[in-house]
Regions:
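Short acidic, glycine/proline-rich loop/turn micro-motifs
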Residues: 12-14, 56-59
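C-terminal helical subdomain
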Residues: 37-52, 58-103
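Short beta->alpha connector loops of Rossmann-like oxidoreductase domains
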Residues: 10, 52-53
Length: 103
């Protein structure tokens, strides 16, 4: 499951979005406990920042670092790492944020 910062903290003027993302996190938690006995690994990913794309990949000047956004390839590598985890050390939740993101 893919969540957002709002999965774990609320922001002003985003109550509806936070409600949905908190609900998604709860669903992932319940499904993880329900499906683990059958060998199904459920993980919730918190994407805490913007994802670089064709528009966001450009820098706007010397004060705009390229590490301001998450790299799609790095996100995919993290997902694939979780898919390949041994059952003895499954991750339940992974938070991903770019170096330049405040938290």
């Amino acid at each position: 499951f893919t969540g957002a910062s709002a999965s774990v903290k609320g922001y002003p003027h985003s109550s509806i979005f936070a409600m949905g993302k908190h609900g998604l996190r709860g669903l992932a938690s319940a499904m993880g406990r329900e499906l683990a006995p059958q060998g199904v690994h459920v993980c919730h990913f918190v994407i805490d920042g913007g994802v670089r794309n064709a528009l966001k990949g450009r820098t706007e000047g010397p004060d705009d670092p390229s590490d301001k956004y998450l790299c799609p390839d790095a996100i995919a590598e993290t997902y694939m790492h979780v898919v390949g985890q041994d059952r003895s050390s499954w991750s339940w939740e992974i938070e991903l944020r770019p170096y330049g993101e405040n938290y």
